[in-house]
Every structure is written in C-alpha cells, then in structure tokens.
Amino acid sequence: PRATVLGYSREAFGTGWASLADGCTTRSKALHSTFGAVPAAAGSPDPCPAPRNDPIRGPYTGTPITPHDVELDHVLPLAAAWDLGAHAWEQPRREAFANDPRNLIVVAAAANQEKSDQLPSEWMPPKRWQRCAYAHRLADVARAYELSLPRADLREMRRACSGVTGLLGARSM
C-alpha cells in the first residue's frame, strides 16, 4: 500500500467538472466521446448536447452500460495522486489533473465505486483483457504528471502486461 499524506479532500482538485468554452463540462465531453452525442434541438437553451443512450460494453466489466448508470473514473485516483505528490501542486495543476481526459474513463458506477482510490496492487479491472490497457493508461498519466508509482503497483502492472510488448519504457516501470 502507498504512504498516505494527510490533508486530502476532493475539493483540493476543484469543486466539480470544469466548464468548457463550448458550454459543456468535462463530464459531458467524456460521455460524448464514449456514447456519441444527440444533436441539440434548434433553439435549445442548453448548448451542450445529451449523450446518445445506446448501450456499450463497459471497459472494466465488459457488461453493457448506458449514460444513466455510469461514472467517470480517474484512472489514477485523486486521493492516490495526492499521496504520490499532488499535495505539493498548485491548485490550477490539481484541477487540470482532475479534468484531464487522459485520466478519465467512463465506467459502470459500481465498478468505479469498487475501485475507489486503489492502485493496481489493490485493484485491477475484473476482465483480464482490460488489465494491460488500464495499466498502460495509468502509467501514461503518472508519467505525464511526474508521479512515481509504488513498486508493488509497478509489479502488478508488469504482470498485467506480461507477454505484451511496448507497455512502458524502463524509466516508468
């Protein structure tokens, strides 16, 4: 398990999803990129279109999900990022991290709640076929924000990708 740094609160990473210039939020954009968007009706007061309601296969569980039963997962959880160094960042960097599309994935709400703030040594997607992609994405986010992952997590990430070439450079793992 990682060392815990006191003082974490969700609000340290902003009060919610960032509002974007087009009137959408980071959450809306993630839903659109996952499900597609329904064009807004002419004259609609809401500039952000609704996501399509067609089910897709959830990336962690493989079960069907729709926009009504999902949450956005921070691939590298905010509390974990805090413990790994985000506690020392300025507020704008923490807010950018919380809203970075590289670190967000639309998943079944239950899967996100099960994962909580755990890193790979404590939690991996239940579907084996998703584990290497998850490890790769988490490593990319950690690298982008210069956060060093604990050895136990790196070991689990390597295990998830054993036999898969090109996961990470030697520096990251």
Identify what each model region corresponds to:
Residues 1-22, 151-155, 166-173:
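N-terminal module-boundary/linker segments of secreted carbohydrate-active enzymes
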Residues 6-67:
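Glycine/proline-rich, flexible active-site/cofactor-binding loop segments
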Residues 55-173:
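Domain-level detector of nuclease and nuclease-like folds
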